[in-house]
Amino acid sequence: MTLVSSELVEGINQLLQVLTTALQQLRVHRAKTRVWGYNRLHDQLTAHAVKLADFQDALIARLLVMDAHVDLQNVGRLRIGQTVEDILASERGLALESVQLCQRLHETSRIDVFTRVLIEKLALSEDERLQSYDQSLELIRQLGTPQFLSTRC
């Protein structure tokens, strides 16, 4: 059994909750964009969901290696967008929450190197998504939704 701090286990489980919420929200958003015919956006959301699922699997594995409790019982509130702009904004919110949790976990004093590297990779990936959402939302503001959709989705 690995000696691990309860703060770290709690933090990883909080991160798992955010990822579980994000995956469920992405499931609905992917379906909506597919039905609406926005294939490029659908493909982007699908690629993001695959990455998140891989990170979720890796975090679960880390907890199991630590002989710690894996808590997947709680899913946060889903913020299902009714428009493409709403979808991007709600996905941005969860990406930001993930980045903030990763930063807090990274500062945990008793964190092993494998978990630290995993959290750094997740933070980097989510930060890239955050920048992508910010860029898309800014383009919507500048171009308007119809023009954005015709050129980007």
Region roles according to the model:
Residues M1-C153:
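Iron-associated oxidoreductase/ferritin-like identity signal
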